[in-house]
Amino acid sequence: MKFRWNSRRFCQESSLERQFIFPRGIFMDLELDAVRRINKLAGQARPVDLMMDLITRYGHWAFLIYGILLWFAPGKNQKHRRESCVAAFLAVCLCSVISLAVGKLWHRGRPFTRDRQIWNFTGHKANASFPSNHAMNSAAVAFQLLRDRMPGCRWMACLAGLLAFSRLFAGMHYPSDILGGGAIAAAVHGVLNKPFAAAFIKKLTGALSLLSDSILYIGKSR
């Protein structure tokens, strides 16, 4: 429901209506205004626009490429690196399932559908806005990499933050979409790093390592 300020209507509303409707409407308007201000930065410097467009469209592929390199890179700590990859992958899967469920229960329209002045320069479709899948999944990966102290983890964390900002810059998400995605990622990260989950991840990593190494060996022997 869109909030529009009307002083006469507000005075006529009951105290109960004011208690629940007014704060929610004000919060949503403040969020929309924040997106509007950030989105106005677009179009002022073409190099920045191109960079943000690339990051918001394709930034998530950097995490996939990083994961592949981390998995196949040789070294003494390969087992530990692969466990980190599996944990990060499971986190993304669980986060995506939660996001899908939330989207079915609550469809929040994207900022550019509420205000035509917001420039949707990526041409993104008007599907559910909450939570931000890109911000959520990149945060889930970054949390795991930082915890396991993987090489380049800080750079990947910075990329996750930049990817989240780019979604605001492009007018595709509200700040609470980003924060909500981060909260889901943090919760999933906490669960997957419990002892019971860690034991499962070790077994799964062993099985996947055997499979990938066997395929690689067969490919080299041909």
Question: Which residues does each PLM region occupy?
Answer:
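Short, Lys/Arg-enriched N-terminal segments with co-localized hydrophobic residues
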Residues: 16-27
